[in-house]
Amino acid sequence: MKRRSFMTSVLLTLYPSLNFGQSLIPIADAHNHLGVLRRNDERIPILGQLMRDSGISLLSWTIVPDGPFLGLRGGGITQVRPANSGDFKASYDRQMGQILGGLKVNGVKVLKNVEDLLESAKGAPYVCLTSEGADFLEGNLDSLEDAYEQGIRHIQLIHYVKNPVGDIQTERPEHGGLTSFGKELVGALNQKGILVDLAHSTSESISHALEISKTPIIWSHSYISNTTSSWNSSGFRSRLLSLKDAKRIADSGGAVGLWALGPSFGVGLGGGIDGYASEIIRMVNLIGAEHVMFGSDQDGLPQGAVINQLSDLRKVVESLSTKGLDEKTIRAIAFENYARCLKTAMQNRKS
């Protein structure tokens, strides 16, 4: 028996409610830091095994260039160390080096084209190399093509540090949305065939990006709320995505990922998997099944996470099935929506 068929058989035995004609639903996570944020993390060399064991075939493996400069202050994450010119690029290079070194031994391939997406949909483990924040560009586009050649196919415009790209949700706004460079960057990402991610952006920045982008844009990780927030809202509330903005992203053909921070959607640690699945269903009812995806933020949440290992996402898929969602809907949420946005972005590359 081929290894892929064997693993499918094992997973269907573990999760019998997923037996849709003996086809295992592939899973993608649009925002995951597994092993990246610590030096020499022991999970990096075995990432391929972890993905195969849980049936995760597409992982947005996410670098955080501003990570070494962040800390907790006043109940939220903010910049606590100054950065000099070149520091963010050096941080990016270090993390990228760790990832590329791990890929030499863990049996996972880097997603680079539509053909790779098709293989991933069949169950082969791939990572989409992602940068959370364009800080590593240091305010110019000179190194963007180099990042593309390394395998970057997904860039989140901003993160937690003040930057030349645009305003962030958690700091007092200074630019009224995206800067001129930020607008130029959105266009450049379109031309390079790199997916644009608006997580951590303000509503004004969302407006600017949607006006410019020729391809669908995503919001990889957070939660949708009927309320609004401001930069000085407490804790995770400053990171919410308003329903109005979520609908605008969906109307453009994009998708919104749900992070694993249970308290943000009223779920304690005890109700983790089922609570996450219930929140996914709520999002489906708000913006449509074709615009909802997983964006766990594994290893990126300081506390309160209800998804702590890759196999938890397989349990979420099982919970969605138990709660009555049909196979087509689950496939869209679990894999196809993120894959569709990536495919459209990659196909838009101008040589």
Each language-model region and where it sits:
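A short linear boundary/processing microfeature
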Residues: 212-215, 225, 348
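Glycine-enriched alpha-helix->loop->beta-strand junction motifs that scaffold or abut catalytic
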Residues: 152-154, 194, 212-218, 252-255
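Ligand/cofactor pocket segment of small-molecule handling proteins
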Residues: 222
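Metal-dependent enolase-superfamily TIM-barrel catalytic cores that perform enediolate-based chemistry
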Residues: 150-195, 200-202
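Substrate-binding cleft of carbohydrate-active enzyme catalytic domains
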Residues: 188-209, 243-251
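N-terminal hydrophobic targeting/anchoring segments and the immediately downstream early-domain regions
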Residues: 5-173, 227-229, 235-294, 298-351
